[in-house]
Each structure stands twice: as structure tokens, then as C-alpha cells.
Curated annotation (Swiss-Prot):
Coiled-coil blocks: 144-423, 461-635
Protein name: Outer dense fiber protein 2
Species classification: Eukaryota, Metazoa, Chordata, Craniata, Vertebrata
Biological-process GO terms, alphabetical: cell differentiation; regulation of cilium assembly; spermatogenesis
Originating gene: ODF2
Subunit-structure text: Self-associates. Associates with microtubules and forms a fibrillar structure partially linked to the microtubule network. Interacts via its C-terminus with PLK1. Interacts with ODF1. Interacts with MARK4; the interaction is required for localization of ODF2 to centrioles. Interacts with TSSK4. Interacts with AKNA. Interacts with CFAP58. Interacts with BBOF1. Interacts with CCDC38. Interacts with CCDC42.
């Protein structure tokens, strides 16, 4: 059968537009015997952008050599070199008749892919666990924020309670001081009344003795006057005076004059004693008033110093509270910054992991497709080699018949030679395609190795993030411990102040209880004073003088009270200034709390960014769908090429034996 009877020239599959890769070929004549060698430059345009790896593989294929008639140079042992700058494919047919392929199935093994998939699964599990841990940490941070807010509210309530307790303590202290002053005044008055009573008793005894003497002198003078009257009356009735009568009269006159002189002396001494008593009482009262005023001034100074110390203590407490508030603000700022950095790192890692997962899945699909196409090409090459063996055997069987009819079959031999050359060229194209597939496979393997290396880098980043998360957890625990210690200290201070308040209350009640018998004693003293006043009505002039002095001392006491009121006003002004400073600190704290309340808006912004990342992920998934469509198109083209190869095999089978 001739080549024309077999349905014309056989169809060869093109490796250009319909193939997987586009090839630009340059043919250069470089052979040891002057035969042309083919130089092919390959540009891989399909697939992902990656690093190209130079691959040099030598595939030795036993091709069928066409029969040459005598007189022509034999084409045996002619080497065909495929040369390319990035990777060179050399095809040198050996002298042996058996076809030996250097390409093995181990080159296309999937063990590396399985190990890579296992590693990817492990990485995915680790990433999921890390994501869960980050979610747990986020929930813990939210819980801690809630606890901090509750603690802040608790602290504010405790501060209000402390302020109320401080006000009550100030009031009770004021009441206690007033009660103490009253009790001390009552004690002083009681002591003064007792001393005055003793002194008055002594003076009373002295005056009573002097009065008794004066009364006795007056009674004696009165008796003498009565006797003188009697004698004068007798003399008037008798109207005659004897010498004895004159002597008695003179004697009575002398006695009367003596009695009057003694009475005047006793009266003078009594007046002197009364004058001295008045002067002594005036000086003593002035000294006592001076002492009481000095005591009151000293008490006012001590009270002022105590109030200044209390104000300094309150200022120190306010400064400590402000420092604690600033520390809490700094801690809240650091916690918010750490949470923000964690969220940003989490989003960045999620985006990177998604991109790497998509790229890995895409690379795995492409590697699988390339392995399938390589296996198919290998099967096709083996089929073509078997066809060539069959053709060689047929040529050897027909050799004897061709020798007999060499002249008649010369044209047919030339046609078969041309057809063999075409098959040789087609086989070279197939080998070139296989080499391209192997190079792409190697490039994908290198890219897969790069992806594995990136996975390792990501693992290191994950370990660093785990360390950072543990550091953050430790910092959070330290912050919680500090908050607990501050809370415990505040509770202890509150308990101490409540204990002091209860002690002040007990002392106040005790003072009130001791105040009742003191009032009774005071009433008794007033009764005794009234009795003494009733017995000393003769000394009203002295009392008027004393009243004028008492008015003076009252005026001085009013001046001291005015000074005390001024001190109280100054204390109130200082307290108002402290309250204003505390309110300013509160306002500042509330403004900083308002700044902290802006954290949910920032979280919303980050959630919006996450939504944008999810939209980008959906776009990448759409691109993946488009790429799968392209891969299906390529598969359909490969099937068409397989159909063409089957038709080529059929055409080879129809060749004349």
C-alpha cells in the first residue's frame, strides 16, 4: 500500500496555540557529520509567575532508522541536540536496538506531595488552634475590660463612701472637740467654783468673826448708851447731881467713847479687809481669765495645727489616688495598644495564611495536572516506540522482498523514508513537549519548596506570636494582681476608716454618757453658787465691778470666738479647694474614660477591614474559579491532542508492510 492510499499525509498535533505551552523554535545545523541540529527556545507563558529553574535531562530514545539504498550515505549515528539557554534537552539515539528511557516513575512520585499535604494539614491545624487561642485571648481581654469597668465603678462607689465617711468623721470630730471644750470648761468652772467656794468660806469665816466682833462692840456700845440714857433719865427725874453721878457720867462717857473708838477701829479693819478681798478677787479673776484665754488660744493653735495635718494627710491621699488613677490609665492604654497590635497581627496573619493556602491549593492542582499530562505523554511515547518497533520489524521482514524488487520499490522506499523522517520530527516534538513538562514540573516543585520554606517562616512567626501572646498574658496577670492589691488596700483603708468611725462614735457616746453626771454636778454647783449669792447680798457693789470685768472678758472671748470662726472659714475654704481639685481629677478621669470608650469604634473599623479582606478573598476565589475553567479548557485541548495521537497511531498501523 502506498502513502497516498492511506488517506494522504498523516495529521500531527500542533504544540502551538492548542497545546499547553507555546513554543518558538529556531533550527540551527550543528551535527558532527554536517547534519542539521534543532535549537528550541521555550517560553512558558501559562500558569503562575514563579522562579524558573534550569533543568538538564538526557533522554536516550532508540529511533527507527530508515532503510537507505546503496550509493547513499547512511544516516546512522547522527546526533540531534536540542539546545536552550535555560534548559537543554539532548536526544542521542544509541547503537543498541533496544529502546531505553532514562525517565523513571520515581521522578513523578507523589510522596513529596503527600508529605507537603501532611505538613500543610498540620500547619492548618496549628493555625486553627492559634486562631482559637487568639479568640480566647480576645474574649478574656473583653472580660478583663468588663472587670476593670466594674472595678472602676466599685472604686468610684468606695470613693464616694470614703468622702461621706470623711465628712461624717469631720462632723463627729467637730462635735467631739465642742464636747471636749464644753467638758473642759465645765471641769474648769467646777474647779474654779470649788476653789472659790473654799476661798469664800474662809473669807466668810473671817468676815463673820469680824462681824461678830463688830456686833459685840455695837451691842456693848448700845448697852453703854442705854445705861447712859438711864443715868441721864434718872438725873432728869432727880434734877440733882451728886459727885458720884457726875463721876458715873464721866465714866460712862469714857466707856462709850472707848466702845465707839473700838467699833470704829473694827469697822475700819473690816472695810480694809473687804477692800483687800475685792482687790485679791479682781487680780485672781484677771489671772484666771488670762489663763483661760491663753489656754483657749493654745487649744485653737493646736486645733489649727491638727487641721493642717489633716489637710496635709488628705492632700497626700488625693495625690496617691491621682497617681493610682494615672497608673490605671497607663495600664489601660498599654492594654488597648497591645490588643490593637494583636488584632492587626492576627488580621495580617490571616490574610497571609489565606493567600498561601490559595496558592498552595492552586500549585497542588497544577502539579497534579502536570503529573497526569506527563503520564499521558509517557504512555503516548511508549505507544509510539512500540509502533516504531513494529515498523522496524516489518521493514526487516520486507527487506528481502525489497532487495528483489529494489528498483520497483525505490519510489515507495523514498516515500517511507520521508514518512520516517516526519515520524522522527514528530517524536522529537513529543520529546520536547515531555522535556517542557518536566521543566515545568521542576519549576512547580521549586515553587512548592519555596512555599514550604514560607510555611517554615510562618511557623517561626507563629512561635514568635505565641511568645508575645504569653508575654501579654503575663502582663495581663501582673496588671490583674496589681488591681487586686490596689482593691485590697482600698478595702483595708475603708475598714480602717470604718473602725475609726465606730471608735469615734463610741467615744462620742461615752462622752455624752459622762456629760449627764457632769451636768448634774453643774446644776448642784449652780445651786451652791445661788446659795452663796443669797448669803453674799452685801457684796453687790463688788459683783457689779466683777460684772464689768466679766463683760470685758466676754468681749475678749467674743474676739477669740471670731478668730476661731475665721479659722473655721479658712478650713472650709481649704476643704472647698480640696473638693474642687478632687472634682477636677474626677473630670479628668471621666474624660480619659470617655477616651477609653472609643475602643469599640476602633474595633468596628478593624471589623470593616476584615470584611474588606473577606471581599478580597471572595475575589481570589472567583479568580480561582476562572483558573479552573482555564484548566478544564486545557484538559479539553489535551484530549483533542490525544485523539490526534490516536489517529496518528492508526495511520502508522495502516502503513504498507
Amino acid at each position: 500500500m502506498s502513502a497516498s492510499s492511506s488517506g494522504g499525509s498523516p495529521r500531527f498535533p500542533s504544540c502551538g496555540k492548542n497545546g499547553v505551552t507555546s513554543l518558538t523554535q529556531k533550527k540551527v545545523l550543528r551535527t558532527p557529520c554536517g547534519a542539521p541540529s534543532v535549537t528550541v527556545t521555550k517560553s512558558h507563558k501559562r500558569g503562575m509567575k514563579g522562579d524558573t529553574v534550569n533543568v538538564r535531562r538526557s533522554v536516550r530514545v532508540k529511533t527507527k532508522v530508515p532503510w537507505m539504498p546503496p550509493g547513499k550515505s547512511s544516516a546512522r549515528h547522527v546526533g540531534c541536540n536540542w539546545e536552550n539557554p535555560p534548559h537543554c534537552l539532548e536526544i542521542t539515539p544509541p547503537s543498541s536496538e533496544k529502546l531505553v528511557s532514562v525517565m523513571r516513575l520515581s521522578d513523578l512520585s507523589t510522596e513529596d506531595d503527600d508529605s507537603g499535604h501532611c505538613k500543610m494539614n498540620r500547619y492548618d491545624k496549628k493555625i486553627d488552634s492559634l486562631m482559637n487561642a487568639v479568640g480566647c485571648l480576645k474574649s478574656e481581654v473583653k472580660m478583663q475590660k468588663g472587670e476593670r469597668q466594674m472595678a472602676k465603678r466599685f472604686l468610684e462607689e468606695r470613693k464616694e463612701e470614703l468622702e461621706e465617711v470623711a465628712q461624717e468623721l469631720a462632723e463627729t470630730e467637730h462635735e467631739n472637740t465642742v464636747l471636749r471644750h464644753n467638758i473642759e470648761r465645765i471641769k474648769e468652772e467646777k474647779d474654779y467654783t470649788m476653789l472659790q467656794k473654799k476661798h469664800l468660806q474662809q473669807e466668810k469665816e473671817c468676815l463673820m468673826s469680824k462681824l461678830v466682833e463688830a456686833e459685840m462692840d455695837g451691842a456693848a456700845a448700845a448697852k453703854q448708851v442705854m445705861a447712859l440714857k438711864d443715868t441721864i433719865g434718872k438725873l432728869k427725874s432727880e434734877k440733882q447731881m451728886t459727885c458720884s453721878d457726875i463721876n458715873t457720867l464721866t465714866r460712862q462717857k469714857e466707856l462709850l467713847l472707848q466702845k465707839l473708838s473700838t467699833f470704829e477701829e473694827t469697822n475700819r479693819t473690816l472695810r480694809d479687809l473687804l477692800r483687800e478681798q475685792h482687790c485679791k478677787e479682781d487680780s485672781e479673776r484677771l489671772m484666771e481669765q488670762q489663763g483661760t484665754l491663753l489656754k483657749r488660744l493654745a487649744e485653737a493653735d493646736s486645733e489649727k495645727a491638727r487641721l493642717l495635718l489633716l489637710l496635709q494627710d488628705k492632700d497626700k491621699e488625693v495625690e496617691e489616688l491621682l497617681q493610682e488613677i494615672q497608673c490605671e490609665k497607663a495600664q489601660a492604654k498599654t492594654a488597648s495598644e497591645l490588643s490593637k497590635s494583636m488584632e492587626t497581627m492576627r488580621g495580617h496573619l490571616q490574610a497571609q495564611l489565606r493567600c498561601k493556602e490559595a496558592e498552595n491549593s492552586r500549585l497542588c492542582m497544577q502539579i497534579k495536572n502536570l503529573e497526569r499530562s506527563g503520564n499521558q505523554h509517557k504512555a503516548e511515547v511508549e505507544a509510539i516506540m512500540e509502533q516504531l518497533k513494529e515498523l522496524k520489524q516489518k521493514g526487516e521482514r520486507d527487506k528481502e522482498s525489497l532487495k528483489k524488487a529494489i528498483r520497483a520499490q525505490k519510489e515507495r522506499a523514498e516515500k517511507s523514508e520521508e514518512y520516517a523522517e516526519q515520524l522522527h520530527v514528530q517524536l522529537a516534538d513529543k520529546d520536547l513537549y515531555v522535556a517542557e513538562a518536566l521543566s515545568t514540573l521542576e519549576s512547580w516543585r521549586s515553587r512548592y519548596n519555596q512555599v514550604v520554606k514560607d510555611k517554615g517562616d510562618l511557623e517561626l512567626e507563629i512561635i514568635v506570636l505565641n511568645d508575645r501572646v504569653t508575654d501579654l498574658v503575663n502582663q495581663q496577670q501582673t496588671l490583674e494582681e496589681k488591681m487586686r492589691e490596689d482593691r485590697d488596700s482600698l478595702v483595708e483603708r475603708l475598714h480602717r476608716q470604718t473602725a475609726e468611725y465606730s471608735a469615734f462614735k463610741l467615744e462620742n457616746e461615752r462622752l455624752k454618757a459622762s456629760f449627764a453626771p457632769m451636768e448634774d454636778k453643774l446644776n448642784q454647783a449652780h445651786i451652791e453658787v445661788q446659795q452663796l449669792k443669797a448669803s453674799v447680798k452685801n457684796y453687790e457693789g463688788m459683783i457689779d465691778n466683777y460684772k464689768s470685768q466679766v463683760m470685758k472678758t466676754r468681749l475678749e472671748a467674743d474676739e477669740v470666738a471670731a478668730q476661731l470662726e475665721r479659722c473655721d472659714k479658712e478650713n472650709k475654704i481649704l476643704k472647698d479647694e480640696m473638693n474642687k481639685e478632687i472634682e477636677a481629677a474626677r473630670r479628668q478621669f471621666q474624660s480619659q474614660l470617655a477616651d477609653l470608650q472609643q475602643l469599640p469604634d476602633i474595633l468596628k473599623i478593624t471589623e470593616a477591614k476584615l470584611a474588606e479582606c473577606q471581599d478580597q478573598l471572595q475575589g481570589y476565589e472567583r479568580k480561582n474559579i476562572d483558573l479552573t475553567a482555564i484548566i478544564s479548557d486545557l484538559r479539553s485541548r489535551v484530549r483533542d491532542w490525544q485523539k490526534g495521537s490516536h489517529e496518528l497511531a492508526r495511520a502508522g498501523a495502516r502503513l504498507p508492510r
